[in-house]
């Protein structure tokens, strides 16, 4: 949570939860893989709720809240998380069981649990351990000692146009890309090319550059303020299209569940195919909606508005939270399956949610006269962020939930038990969100919101996503938001959807273009996209090389070695991220540095970039050698 508020970076919790669960339960006799999976499932859902930091701090940054009310914060986290679990239950069959989506973290977590469960699984443990040690060491050099850059870029200037050739050095993302595969990798590459080879050069060439700004700084500003919104529009239209495509299998999944409820032949034959019953889901949904109504009522009751308008806003915002929540659950689950939870642009989903909620409340504000006062506009902005916080927790849990269900499918867990564990995890996690946020706020403050006048603004947590969401909402209510780029992204997405449909038709679904992955390539920083793309191409090259041998047994071994080593890379970097987060938090809370382990070498920037590139290449070579040893066994 600290790192998310400081630099906008969070990490998927499923894999650290799997490792910790496996390590702890090893001390108990006869612990099983299913017990490990249950603990991992519950722990990961609790940790995922921390992503509420993408929106909620905005209420303090705009001056509407002075602290984080425990019950309101707890209720929206628990309710939003539970919605995320419920909405992904009918998606499980469509997106996990009957889908070829890779779910990289889910597969990695399953391999960890399998390797730790079998007494004869030494080879699996070794592959995971090798990958984990390598990625952990690289992460320590990068984020701990800070002697190695996490990425590098080559800039090409042609007149006023700036082209970037970027590269990130994350081995965890390299492993995620290996699991994602070539189709998703090519789509993300197209997004990167459209961004840094077309859009950014066009805007830098067509606009005047400030006298005191470098071309590189101007290019990065163009990406942040314009091109990223094109990615938001592309992701939005692609998510809607994906939801329409998935509607039929989702309905079939729900029909299957209702048949089981009636006691059909399939009712109890397959333990690994049983979800929570529709009857139970309806009861939980009603209770969850009641929690949302209660939290919204208490939030709105503090505003000086009429009882009738208060009731209207409670009803409308509850509907928006549930309706948009279902939409983002499907979109987030699909993106998590396509590119992984760590690379899934949750903040992009949050932006779409904030825009939709703001537009609805704008119409109510105009009709009710709330726009006539500054306080009325401030209240509607705050209500937008409060409602969007429910939606963002729904998106984050669904993003993580389907990874956990993929893990469960691979280790033959019972889905309904996992779903119960996920809901319990949501409530447990919700209990600690408000106290932790309160501690961080009073320890550091947020940008533009310091709890005490004597605090150092330079030490404040920037909360970049919350700042962005607040600015977008305020821009809509003050009619200052630039819509051109979002609509451009929608148009681009529509063109790409047409191309995808054409490719599938002429190739009999052999070729496709995942439009959401293209949008992700536009929206996310290139340091995240590029190692994923490299990993995807590495998997393709390895598969083609092994396939030339014509030995199916060797191909199967190579695939398993690659999966295990990828899992190790993801595990190592994730765990090192957790360890460094604790070290940094301990240092800062005691008045120390934000980089307590940094060597602070002078004139090291260029050397650090070359060092990072060399280590990244070495990591690729080691990865390939671990896969190719399948030919020798």
Swiss-Prot record:
It is found in: Cell membrane. One of its GO terms (biological process) is protein transport. InterPro entries: Oligopep_transpt, OPT, YSL-like. GO terms for molecular function: oligopeptide transmembrane transporter activity. The keyword Transmembrane applies. The chain crosses the membrane at residues 8-28, 45-65, 70-90, 128-148, 180-200, 230-250, 281-301, 311-331, 345-365, 379-399, 420-440, 483-503, 515-535, 564-584, 604-624. It is a multi-pass membrane protein. GO terms for cellular component: membrane; plasma membrane. It holds the Pfam family OPT. The keyword Ribosomal protein does not apply. Keywords: Cell membrane, Membrane, Peptide transport, Protein transport, Transmembrane, Transmembrane helix, Transport. It comes from the Bacteria. Belongs to the oligopeptide OPT transporter family. This is Putative oligopeptide transporter HI_0561. It comes from Haemophilus influenzae (strain ATCC 51907 / DSM 11121 / KW20 / Rd). The lineage of its organism: Bacteria, Pseudomonadati, Pseudomonadota, Gammaproteobacteria, Pasteurellales.
């Amino acid at each position: 949570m600290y790192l998310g508020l400081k630099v906008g970076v969070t990490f998927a919790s499923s894999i650290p939860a799997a490792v910790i669960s496996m390590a702890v339960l090893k001390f108990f006799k006869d612990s099983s893989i299913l017990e490990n999976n249950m603990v991992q499932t519950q722990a990961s859902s609790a940790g995922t709720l921390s992503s509420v930091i993408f929106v909620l701090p905005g209420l303090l940054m705009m001056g509407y809240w002075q602290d984080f009310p425990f019950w309101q914060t707890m209720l929206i986290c628990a309710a939003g998380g539970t919605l995320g679990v419920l909405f992904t239950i009918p998606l499980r069959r469509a997106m996990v069981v009957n889908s070829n989506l890779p779910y990289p973290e889910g597969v990695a977590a399953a391999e960890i649990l399998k390797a730790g469960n079998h007494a004869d699984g030494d080879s699996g443990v070794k592959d995971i351990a090798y990958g984990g040690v390598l990625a952990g060491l690289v992460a320590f050099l990068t984020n701990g000692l800070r002697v190695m850059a996490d990425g590098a870029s080559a800039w090409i200037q042609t007149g006023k146009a700036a082209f970037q050739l970027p590269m990130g050095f994350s081995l965890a993302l390299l492993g995620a890309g290996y699991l994602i595969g070539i189709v998703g990798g090519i789509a993300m590459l197209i997004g990167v090319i459209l961004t840094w080879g077309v859009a950014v050069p066009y805007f830098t060439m067509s606009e005047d550059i400030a006298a005191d700004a470098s071309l590189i700084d101007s290019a990065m500003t163009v990406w942040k303020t314009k091109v990223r919104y094109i990615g938001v529009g592309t992701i939005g239209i692609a998510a809607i299209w994906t939801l329409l495509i998935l509607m039929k299998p989702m309905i079939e999944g729900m029909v299957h569940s209702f048949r089981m409820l009636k006691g059909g032949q399939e009712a109890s034959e397959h333990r690994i195919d049983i979800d929570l019953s529709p009857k139970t889901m309806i009861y939980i949904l009603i209770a969850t909606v009641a929690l949302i109504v209660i939290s919204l009522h208490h939030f709105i009751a503090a505003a000086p508005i009429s009882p009738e308008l208060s009731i209207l806003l409670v009803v409308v915002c509850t509907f928006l939270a549930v309706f948009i929540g279902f939409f983002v659950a499907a979109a987030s689950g699909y993106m998590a399956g396509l590119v992984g939870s760590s690379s899934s642009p949750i903040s992009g989903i949050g932006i779409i949610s904030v825009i939709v909620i703001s537009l609805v409340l704008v119409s109510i504000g105009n009709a009710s006269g709330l726009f006539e006062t500054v306080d009325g506009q401030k209240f509607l902005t705050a209500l937008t962020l409060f409602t969007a916080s429910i939606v963002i927790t729904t998106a984050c849990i669904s993003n993580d939930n389907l990874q956990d269900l993929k893990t469960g499918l691979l280790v033959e867990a019972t889905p309904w038990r996992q779903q119960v564990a996920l809901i319990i995890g949501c409530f447990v996690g919700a209990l600690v969100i408000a106290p932790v946020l309160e501690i961080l706020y009073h320890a550091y403050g947020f940008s533009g919101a310091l709890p005490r006048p004597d605090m150092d603004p330079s030490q404040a947590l920037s909360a970049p996503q919350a700042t962005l969401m607040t600015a977008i909402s305020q821009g809509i209510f003050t009619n200052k938001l630039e819509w051109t780029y979002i609509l451009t992204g929608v148009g681009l997405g529509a063109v790409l959807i047409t191309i995808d449909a054409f490719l599938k038709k002429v190739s009999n679904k052999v070729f496709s273009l995942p439009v959401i992955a293209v949008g992700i390539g536009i929206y996310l920083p290139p340091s995240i996209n590029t190692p994923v793309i490299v990993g995807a191409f590495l998997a393709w090259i390895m598969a083609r090389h092994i396939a030339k041998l014509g030995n199916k047994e060797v191909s199967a071994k190579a695939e398993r070695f690659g999966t295990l080593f990828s899992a190790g890379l993801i595990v190592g970097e994730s765990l090192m991220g957790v360890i460094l987060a604790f070290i940094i938090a301990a240092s800062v809370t005691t008045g120390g540095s934000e980089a307590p382990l940094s060597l602070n070498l002078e004139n090291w920037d260029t050397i650090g970039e070359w060092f990072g590139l060399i280590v990244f290449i070495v990591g690729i070579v080691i990865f390939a050698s671990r896969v190719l040893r399948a030919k020798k066994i």
